């Protein structure tokens, strides 16, 4: 059973320097926090990401300081040691990141824990892990933000998985200002985005539009 307030999952930014460029990363995050994102996951991974652990730690510390200023949860993707060193608010892991030992250790340290799922079997397996707080399901639509993205699930499958899950579901993958309302209507707890914010011409306006579906249906999430 999850121990977190589902509201923190509503407008969930996932980003690293590979999504913004190094110079723009912190200013974009600052704008996004000021405009009302509810959660931030530091995911610095893949081509054009930071080349050393020391640099990654430095950017993560600065991102964490911004998140604390705005009282927004700061989640680390995959890197348990970094999450523990920084006393991050949470850890998110994928199916290929040796998830269960990391989730258990993270929970022992009081961190929020999230796991990426793509199949019904992965969701059912998540029910056996009491240390897990939420799951990320995706990609929902085609996306260019992740090189290793799997086949898109679509809205009907997302709704079915949300009903199957005993935990709050965060949708991710190809979510945009145009389709976020449809995503919210599936009953998910929130939507995680990368380019919808990092590539937005007007970040405050983009976040206002991403927030809208949750504000108009407050309290109706996770319906069956």
Swiss-Prot record:
BP GO annotations: thiamine biosynthetic process; thiamine diphosphate biosynthetic process
The cross-references to CDD domains, in alphabetical order and at most eight, read: TMP_TenI
**What is catalysed by this protein?**
2-[(2R,5Z)-2-carboxy-4-methylthiazol-5(2H)-ylidene]ethyl phosphate + 4-amino-2-methyl-5-(diphosphooxymethyl)pyrimidine + 2 H(+) = thiamine phosphate + CO2 + diphosphate; 2-(2-carboxy-4-methylthiazol-5-yl)ethyl phosphate + 4-amino-2-methyl-5-(diphosphooxymethyl)pyrimidine + 2 H(+) = thiamine phosphate + CO2 + diphosphate; 4-methyl-5-(2-phosphooxyethyl)-thiazole + 4-amino-2-methyl-5-(diphosphooxymethyl)pyrimidine + H(+) = thiamine phosphate + diphosphate
Q: Which residues bind 2-[(2R,5Z)-2-carboxy-4-methylthiazol-5(2H)-ylidene]ethyl phosphate?
A: 143-145, 174, 194-195
Which Pfam family, just one, is annotated for this protein?
TMP-TENI
Q: Which GO CC terms are listed, alphabetically?
A: cytoplasm
Q: Which cofactor does it need?
A: Mg(2+)
- Enumerate the UniProt keywords alphabetically: Magnesium, Metal-binding, Thiamine biosynthesis, Transferase
Record has Transferase as a keyword = yes
Q: Which residues bind Mg(2+)?
A: 78, 97
Which EC class is this protein assigned? transferase
Q: How is the cofactor bound?
A: Binds 1 Mg(2+) ion per subunit.
EC numbers on record: 2.5.1.3
- Binding-site residues for 4-amino-2-methyl-5-(diphosphooxymethyl)pyrimidine, renumbered to this chain: 41-45, 77, 116, 146
Enumerate the GO terms in the molecular function aspect: magnesium ion binding; thiamine-phosphate diphosphorylase activity
NCBIfam families assigned: thiE
The family annotation for this protein states: Belongs to the thiamine-phosphate synthase family.
Task of the protein: Condenses 4-methyl-5-(beta-hydroxyethyl)thiazole monophosphate (THZ-P) and 2-methyl-4-amino-5-hydroxymethyl pyrimidine pyrophosphate (HMP-PP) to form thiamine monophosphate (TMP).
Q: Output this protein's name.
A: Thiamine-phosphate synthase
